[in-house]
Regions:
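Surface-exposed patches in mature extracellular/periplasmic domains of secreted proteins
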Residues: 58-70, 293, 395-399, 499, ...
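Short pre-active-site segment immediately N-terminal to the catalytic Zn-binding motif
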Residues: 462-481
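Active-site-proximal, well-structured secondary-structure segments within enzyme catalytic domains
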Residues: 148, 187, 192-232, 280, ...
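N-terminal helix-rich structural modules
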Residues: 11-209, 213-215, 641, 698
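Short His/Asp/Glu-rich catalytic/ion-coordination signatures at enzyme active sites or charged loops
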Residues: 25-40, 89-108, 131-173, 232-272, ...
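Short, hydrophobic/amphipathic alpha-helical patches that form generic packing surfaces
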Residues: 80-91, 150, 154, 256, ...
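C-terminal, non-catalytic "cap/extension" segments appended to globular domains
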Residues: 14-35, 208, 216, 228-230, ...
Length: 698
């Protein structure tokens, strides 16, 4: 086997000693983290790339006439080594990055982009796929195989398979640059977010935080080897501590540090990177024959066109902003009643909104948290709902190696006792972990490859001090249910082909199962099962439950407006014309929000352009609207469950059979309508948020 240079420049052989050389012998082919070293990834990825290119060349140059088996099935079977490594590499770099892994990521990202070009821009290979596509009605394919053929043909066309050789060369250069810029953005943002942490030696500046929160902040400072207290930044604009901090100067400092984290004029400033990314994507779309990058990206999504997605969002803006303005008026009235002597600013919103909530509903976040202990929420909430709906059960596996000690592993069994999946959870915040929460696979399900799913969830909950419980906000609880909804989508995958399996669906469908699963967090058949005091085990008092339910639609104007602002901002960035000059991100952002009636001074976007990880680093470019689109689907879906008896095995099994197990094996619009029995609409979505439907602004 050839030698490849390691991250340090030394020559590293890829051979049997590398843990990725052969499929893992652990249960479910779980990654052997006890054997994997940082230096193992690069040689394995490079060997995997070379191997798949050889496999693709053999398929493309096969002298035999193309058949479904010798072309489409052969493509599905190719790349098993590179996929085996890359699934694990992506998981570890997202959740446990270090300098050596960062160097490896920088080096392999353009090579992996080139691999995709080597497949989808291969003229001989496309001719074989195209011939089969043109003759598809004569091939007697089963529905899933027909879907694979039609899907792959579309993907080849969208990737540029029909371009001239000269244009393919241009496209490859753009793809390589995009891969490099994406990696650079991720690296810069991780460092910028870490350096934006708020550090103080003055305990009085942190007045309002609980003793547990202060202890966690002291621990965080100690880990960074600084004196005092440290509050690290989450990926969103607003920060959770702003609900509690009574010192307005501290709130402003934290908010502005969050807002400007990647705009400090230093090496981690992302503005030049994102400006070029947006310009490059517009150029790429033009080369591929589309009016904008968004038009290209949405060609294989449920919405179909950016115009459809924007129209959908425009319909939500009036209701959202009207509610947000009403909420702002309530908050200003409270500030005035307290003789605050200042106008509401964005760093004040969460602090005073929490007070308004207390006044309106007599509800305090600190009253609620003791009833949401992480392990209890997981086992008696998340797992319980899944068991009641789908009959599955969970057993912790302490014998499966993990990449950091905080990670837990569970074996998931079906109702008949058969092994279904492995599931990992990595819930606590670390400085070397990307912000937010997500799900992905270490191993994907495929009957063709004989693999069962190995799925993981990652979050950024505050880690308690030693010996203390991890108490969650209800937003955190909802996040757990959300990400586990993605996990169920992956675990219930029951498809032949890996390309169509599990969460391998359009962005504006993939968030539907996850957001649907959020509903069970507050469902009356589930909530009492896990909402119990961590000290006494007593259930949450009925009076407190009622307050929580009544406050469910509180602050929804703000929440929907900040989400719409981010989604519209994303769409504006990705509908630029190809000849657009490099944009000034701050000016562009201001103008884009004003144009969409979303420039509310007290309601900033959930993400500003400079730290919008979803669209510059996580594959959601021209796709952040998907969260709202899927909210329409999931609220309609939960309404169906309520109308048909709620949390029952019959309902769960039907949903699993018709939606969760199907991956992308059918037209998803038809799949959804067949399950629901109707067209989706925004009425249940607005009802769930406590909003009134209003006509869009003109």
């Amino acid at each position: 086997m050839a030698l490849t240079p390691g991250a340090s420049g030394a020559q590293t052989a890829f051979g049997p000693a590398n843990p990725f050389y052969a499929p893992s012998t652990l249960p479910f082919h779980a990654p052997p983290f006890d054997k994997i070293k940082d230096g193992d990834y690069k040689p394995a990825i490079e060997a995997g790339i070379a191997q798949q290119l050889e496999e693709i060349h053999a398929i493309a140059s096969n002298p035999a006439e193309p058949t479904f088996d010798n072309t489409l099935v052969a493509i599905e079977k190719s790349g098993q080594l590179v996929n085996r490594v890359n699934y694990v590499f992506n998981g570890v770099t997202g959740a446990n990055m270090n300098p050596e892994l960062q160097t490896t990521q920088d080096e392999v990202a353009p090579k992996l982009a080139a691999l995709q070009d080597g497949i989808y821009l291969n003229t001989q290979l496309f001719k074989r796929v195209e011939k089969l596509y043109n003759e598809r009605n004569k091939l007697n394919l089963d529905p899933e195989s027909m879907r694979l053929l039609e899907y792959q043909y579309q993907e080849f066309v969208l990737a540029g398979a029909r371009l001239s050789e000269a244009d393919k060369t241009k496209l490859k250069k753009l793809n390589e640059e995009e891969a490099n810029l994406t990696t650079a953005f991720i690296s810069k943002l991780l460092a910028a977010t870490k350096s934006a942490a708020y550090i103080t030696k003055d305990k009085a500046a942190l007045a309002g935080l609980s003793d547990a929160e202060l202890a966690a902040a002291a621990d965080a400072a100690h880990e960074r080897k600084v004196d005092g207290w440290l509050l690290s930044m989450q990926n969103t604009t607003q920060q959770p501590e702003l609900e509690s901090l009574s010192n307005r100067t501290t709130r402003q400092a934290i908010f502005e540090s969050s807002l400007n984290r990647a705009e400090r004029g230093d090496k981690n400033d992302t503005r030049a990177t994102i400006a070029r990314l947006a310009q490059l994507r517009a150029q790429k779309a033009k080369l591929l024959g589309y009016t904008s990058y968004a038009a290209w990206r949405l060609a294989d999504q449920m919405a179909g066109t950016p115009e459809t997605a924007v129209k959908f969002m425009d319909e939500l803006v009036p209701a959202a902003t009207a509610k947000a303005q009403g909420e702002a008026n309530d908050i200003q009235a409270l500030i005035d009643a307290q003789h605050g002597g200042f106008k509401l600013a964005p760093w004040d919103w969460n602090f005073y909104a929490e007070q308004v909530r207390k006044a309106k509903f007599d509800l305090d976040e600190s009253q609620v948290k003791p009833y949401f202990e992480l392990n209890n929420v997981l086992e008696n909430g998340v797992f319980y709902a899944a068991h009641m709906l789908y009959g599955i059960s969970f057993k912790q596996r302490t014998d499966i190696p993990v990449y950091v000690p905080d990670v837990k592993v569970y074996e998931v069994s079906d109702a008949d006792g058969k092994p279904l999946a492995l599931w990992y959870c990595d819930y606590f915040k670390r400085d070397n972990k990307n912000g937010g929460a997500w799900m992905d696979n270490f191993v994907g399900q495929s009957k063709l490859l004989g693999t069962l799913p190995v799925v993981y969830n990652v979050a950024n909950f505050s880690k308690p001090t030693a010996g203390e419980p991890a108490l969650l906000s209800f937003d955190d609880v909802t996040t757990m249910f959300h990400e586990f909804g993605h996990a169920l989508h992956g675990m219930f995958a029951d498809t032949m082909y890996p390309t169509l399996s599990g969460t391998q669906t359009p962005r504006d469908f993939v968030e539907f199962p996850s957001q649907f699963n959020e509903h069970w967090a507050s469902d009356r058949a589930v909530f009492p099962h896990y909402a119990k005091h961590y000290k006494t085990g007593e259930p949450m008092p009925a009076e407190l439950v009622a307050k929580l339910e009544k406050s469910a639609t509180f602050n929804q104007g703000y929440k929907l407006t900040e989400l719409l602002a981010a989604a519209q901002l994303d769409m504006q960035w990705h509908t630029l014309e190809d000849d657009s000059k490099l944009q000034d991100p701050d000016k562009f952002e201001s103008e884009a929000l004003s144009m969409k009636w979303l420039a509310l001074p007290t309601v900033p976007p959930r993400y500003r352009s400079s730290y919008f990880m979803h669209i510059w680093g996580n594959g959601y470019q021209a796709g952040y609207y998907a969260y709202l689109w899927c909210e329409m689907l999931d609220d309609d879906a939960y309404q169906w469950f309520e109308d048909h008896g709620g949390l029952t095995r019959a309902n769960g099994d039907r949903f699993r059979r018709m939606i969760l197990s199907r991956g992308n094996t059918s037209d998803l619009d038809q799949l959804y309508k067949a399950w629901l029995g109707a067209e989706p609409g925004i009425a249940p979505m607005l009802k769930a948020r406590g909003l009134e439907q209003r006509a869009p602004a003109k």
